[in-house]
Amino acid sequence: MRKVFLSLAVLASSVASAQLVNVGSIEKINLPSGVRTIESVMSPDGSFAVINAAGSLQKVDLATGKIVKIADDASSGMEISKDGNTLIYEQSVFKDKLRYTNLKSVNLNNGKESTLVNASRNLQGYALSKNSVGAVDNGKYTAKSLNSAAPSLVTVASIKAGALIVSVNGVSNNISPQGTTGQSYLWPSVSPDGKKVLYYLCGEGAFVCNLDGSNPVSVGMMRAPKWYNNKVVVGMQDEDNGDYVTGSKLVASSVDGKVMQDLTQISSMAMYPSVAANGSKVSFVTPAGELFILNIK
């Protein structure tokens, strides 16, 4: 596998007067023939990414180009533990014409797999913190340890019947800042410092609020938003003609909603960003199944 560096004049633009993220270069990662990825997740240190290629999870070493298959049974949704050793992912299974979701973990060093949540009909969401995974399954909160230490309580933002739920210290509450009547919330996550919630409100855009739902602030029309750090979020602005995506770009916004920056141009077809916890890289995929990396200065 080789890397292709693309011209920033072609793919990236920014607001020079108020730059939130300083993009140094954009790389296209050439995947093996026939491999198309639908999503990616960055490791915390930016050294590797994991891609989902039609259910096959593959670890891509960004320095050497080495690709290692991790699992063959994924559906969607992935997270990597803070130490970079464990991947959490969702697996869909079907029984009696009903769809169930397993939440699984796999050790990236030895391949050992574990099931954290088994055969859920309503896995609302999950989050990782240090050695623990917090998951909300049909309103019930559980915490599981990824090693031999006792699990800690992880703050989780999740969705139930379109409403925004936040679980703090194992207690779940419906915080839906804009209410629930006629509203649908998506893509919730808790900030790295555990103090704020980022979410997307269908038809309205992305917002940041407090853990209790107070003080919702618009951070712009971006979908699939992710935390870059405690002060900046990133997401995608995609366009379509009703049948397929015609353009998509990555954008960044300050959490107060006052500054927005383009990270790529609309022609880049950039979708579904994932951020390395150290801020060094942002990965994205395209409708063609390609994997790109933004290297941050």
Which role does the model predict for each range below?
Residues M1-L20:
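Bacterial Sec-dependent N-terminal signal peptides
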Residues Q19-K297:
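Sequence signature of WD/YWTD-type beta-propeller architectures
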